[in-house]
């Protein structure tokens, strides 16, 4: 379980030769530039130009129809934009996440294997017309580009706002209207949810992952504005000194923060680890523990994406308004 927690925390911090086919969009890498994008603000027809994080200026002649993702954190965005990919890594893992279960039940994706070891042969068999990944796929960029044109996104700066990744991907695939509609839908949900949580304005909250007996992953305020921001999020209050960015803290540091409520990432084996903690005097003295205010949220609610944010918001509200 410790390995799972480390992977998920890394995700958040990160969150940081063409295959011929008659109906494929024609996409050419023209040159390199330091610009971020040449897309207009509103949805535009094709052809369109996009400049990715490597500085490649890519002209997309037609709207892509067979998209392959080589970074699994981006997959939920494709579902949100009503454009499920044909293939992605770690589909088996994602199928266990509560937020993605309904999407994966309705859409069959070819599993490309591990996020860190993409099955290139299987990807070739898929015959994508566009591959989307992140800068963490740069090591296999040359291999990927022999299969289909590649767009690499720098998701690290985008991960600080759940709206950014949908908007950025929408520029690539021509789904700006879908992105804005889904964003508006979630923004309205957050506004309604914030009103329901007004009785908790004087209480403090922490969002954690139990790494081991001595430390916790802590999900920072800047990384989770949907939970903490008073204008664009639920407006939950963190304890004084709560980290701005996602990282790790000791049990002793958690005791200093002493939140009234703790939302804990639910992963396999968490119940047993909590049982082991019951004998720890520091843990038992926490305000949240004494008050019975330690709650579980499925791990899929901590990945910062638009679907994860919606899932997390709904679960926080459901938990606190039972």
Language-model segments: residues:
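Bacterial Sec-exported substrate-binding components of ABC uptake systems
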Residues: 3-9, 19-73, 178-206, 268, ...
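Extracytoplasmic substrate-binding proteins
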Residues: 140, 146-212, 302, 306-322
């Amino acid at each position: 379980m410790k390995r799972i927690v480390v992977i998920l925390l890394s995700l958040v911090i990160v969150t940081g030769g063409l295959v011929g086919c008659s109906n494929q969009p024609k996409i050419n890498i023209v040159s390199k530039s330091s610009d971020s994008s040449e897309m207009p603000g509103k949805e535009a027809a094709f052809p369109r130009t996009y400049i990715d994080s490597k500085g490649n200026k890519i002209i997309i002649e037609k709207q892509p129809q067979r998209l392959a993702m080589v970074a699994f954190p981006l997959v939920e965005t494709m579902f949100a934009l009503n454009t499920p990919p044909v293939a992605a890594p770690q589909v088996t893992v994602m199928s266990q996440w509560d937020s993605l279960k309904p999407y994966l039940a309705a859409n069959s994706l070819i599993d490309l294997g591990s996020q860190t070891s993409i099955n290139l042969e299987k990807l070739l068999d898929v015959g994508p017309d566009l591959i989307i990944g992140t800068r963490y796929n740069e090591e296999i960029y040359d291999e990927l580009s022999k299969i289909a044109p590649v767009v690499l996104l720098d998701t690290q700066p985008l991960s600080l706002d759940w709206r950014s990744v949908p908007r950025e991907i929408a520029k690539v695939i021509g789904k700006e209207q879908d992105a804005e509609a889904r964003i508006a839908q979630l923004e309205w949900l957050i506004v309604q949810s914030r009103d329901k949580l007004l009785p908790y304005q004087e209480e403090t909250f922490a969002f954690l992952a139990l790494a081991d007996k001595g430390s916790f992953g802590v999900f920072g305020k800047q990384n989770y504005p949907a939970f903490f921001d008073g204008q664009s999020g639920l407006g939950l209050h963190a304890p004084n000194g709560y980290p701005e960015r996602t990282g790790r803290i000791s049990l002793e540091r958690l005791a200093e923060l002493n939140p009234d409520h703790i939302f804990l990432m639910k992963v396999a084996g968490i119940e047993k680890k909590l049982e082991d903690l019951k004998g720890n005097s520091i843990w038992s003295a926490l305000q949240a523990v004494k008050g019975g205010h330690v709650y579980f949220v499925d791990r899929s609610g901590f990945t910062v994406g638009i679907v994860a944010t919606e899932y997390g918001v709904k679960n926080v509200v459901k938990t606190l308004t039972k």
